[in-house]
Amino acid sequence: MKVGLVYYGGQYNHLILKNVKYLGADIEVIPPHKPVEELKKFDCVIFSGGPYSVSEEIQKMGNSPLYIKELKVPMLGICLGHQLIAYVLGGVVRRALNPEYGLTRINIFDEDTILKGFSQQLNVWESHNDEVVEPPSGFRVLASSANARVQAMANSSNSIFGVQFHPEVKHTERGIEIFKNFLGVCRK
């Protein structure tokens, strides 16, 4: 299986590579200016974290809006990638009233896909100034925290996912399982 990782300069991206490789998948880093055709070789795509604000700096994300709209493969957005997916597909993203940094407890409401087998609460690593306040039409909220209503989301066909937190960071409990569950969706 081949995974594309769209890279926005996030500080934890090497950990995404490490986790996906550990789980036995091939992964390739893709700069966001590549034509959408070059991403059609991947079985799934992960949109990484990064320092940008999607509502103010979308141009810095290159062709990523086209990737989200045109690729017909499973997708996972992490932090900035989560916000990008929501924004491009019609959700609402804004500056967080209470930015989250460090360990945060989330409440899981729906665990049937990327959060499969998880308990109702999970400690996760956060690092964000912006947040998704309303997911796109056709998406459901999988998890929330005291400060961010949309900590995880999925579309109705369980093929596009977003998580506000960083599953790649060791401080996130069971983070490797989120990648494992996502790769399971990619293999279907």
Curated annotation (Swiss-Prot):
It catalyses: XMP + L-glutamine + ATP + H2O = GMP + L-glutamate + AMP + diphosphate + 2 H(+). PROSITE patterns: GATASE_TYPE_1. Residues 2-188 form the Glutamine amidotransferase type-1 domain. Pathway: Purine metabolism; GMP biosynthesis; GMP from XMP (L-Gln route): step 1/1. GO terms for molecular function: ATP binding; GMP synthase (glutamine-hydrolyzing) activity. Pfam families: GATase. It comes from the Archaea. Heterodimer composed of a glutamine amidotransferase subunit (A) and a GMP-binding subunit (B). Catalyzes the synthesis of GMP from XMP. This is GMP synthase [glutamine-hydrolyzing] subunit A. The gene is guaAA.
